[in-house]
Amino acid sequence: MQANTASLPADGAPVENPAARLISIPFLLLRISTAGGAFAMGLVQTLVFARVLMPDRFSLFILVGAIGYSLWLCDLGLAKILFVQLRAAHLAGKTDARAASQATAVIVFYVLLAAGGSLVCFGLMAVRPSFSLLDATDFGLFFFYITLNLTWVCLRSLSIAVDEYVFYEKLELVRRVGNMATILAMLIGLPFTAFLVGSNVLWAMLVTSAVAKLLSRGAMAPQLRGFARELMAFFQTNMQSIARSGTFALSDIFIYTFPYYVVPWAFGLGAPIIILEATFRIFRGASVIYTAACDLAIPGQTRALAARDAAMLVRTTLIAAALCCLPAAFACGLLIFASKQLFAFLLGSAATVPPTVTPILVVMLLANLVQMVAQSLLLHAGFFREISRIGLGVAVAMVAATAIAVVAGLTIVEFLGVYAAVYSAGALYLAVAAYRGPILAAASPHGAVKWKRAAEPAAAR
């Protein structure tokens, strides 16, 4: 296991202000509102798309969105590595100019990746005789709208690293409110293309604001010339960490997106993929809320690791887990007692979700809670090697289970059951790794003896 405890001061003293050691109240309020907005926006998008698009067109946009999220395969965990480096410098009261330049290079790379992918999407749709140029433009803009999330998530990691999480969450709140307003406006006649153009313009404004703030805090460098050189230097310097965190990032996004490729192939477009989208919209929405709760604990967790304060590390992690339990209990209760009404309201006449999906989704939500709490602690403590091994193992198991499900001729509901079983096993393994890794590492300099390189700085990795 490769912990990052040494990249934070090993002899750091505990923070004097106890309140600063746990959770920021302004961050708590903002993060709850933006996470709730993210969950609501996902449901609203599905609800509106199901009503303004024909089922076959709706299923195509679902597939294009899944392909867009698949570009996160190019993330390779770069944002997490930048977080570790910038956070270490910030806690030491310093500015890491090299890390700032490389952060700029990574952000530019992500923006260019989104733009290039959207142009490819436009071109592929434009050559199909069944689509007009306007249709192709819509698909390209939607692809760009989806893939810019990769840039935005990286900006979030950089903001948290330098304690600018409140500013970031204000921008996130603006984004959620603006996007939800334009989505709902389609119900009263706003053209679909206008929604896409407006949403991407909003993206441009928000990304510009976030970058400006990070530049002022020294977390990014005010230069674009030579960004390719800085990007290559970042890859060369952090090759081992990228290989490990990248393995996790690849397997993680694969686990979440590969059903969108399996279902159209094995079960067809139309109702099957719409059922998958409705199920995963709730599943991924819960992930956003869980991530928000876990983000609240990151400043306290990293300070606890720096001070080797295991008690504080456990307290902040348990607080995050408790916060996750609140929305989980609400969502599970809603599904158990009103899933039929919920899915009918969400999808209208586009598709009908079988009632047997409900218990499977409840299991997925609970497993996701365990996974997100453990994974967040491992990631932000720098334990990339172990999470990459677990992620790779879960991905391989998922492929094998899917192959068996397809050969056996299982239904889409049975396929979702197999997915939930493998996913739950991976979540439990991550929980064990979180205890054996960062918690033991914080308890004692020798507490994580099994992780041989726990004292190696992030830059050397």
Which residues fall in each region the model found?
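Interhelical loop/hinge segments that connect adjacent transmembrane helices in multipass membrane
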Residues: Q2-S24, T193-N200, A210-Y256, G300, ...
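Interfacial segments at transmembrane-helix termini and the short loops linking adjacent helices
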Residues: A20, M125-F142, G270, A311, ...
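Membrane-water interface segments that mark the loop-to-transmembrane alpha-helix transition
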Residues: P26-A38, V64, W72-M125, R308-C332, ...
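Transmembrane helical elements of multi-pass membrane transporters/channels
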Residues: P26-T46, E172-N179, S199-M220, R229-P299, ...
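Small-residue hotspots at the loop-to-helix junctions and early N-terminal turns
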Residues: F58-I62, A66, F139, G270-R281, ...
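Helix-loop junctions and terminal segments of transmembrane helices
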Residues: L76-A92, A161, M220-A221, F283-R308, ...
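Hydrophobic alpha-helical transmembrane segments
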Residues: G140, E169-M220, G393-A397, T411-R436
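Membrane-interface junctions at transmembrane-helix termini in multi-pass inner-membrane proteins
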Residues: L148-V174, V363-G393
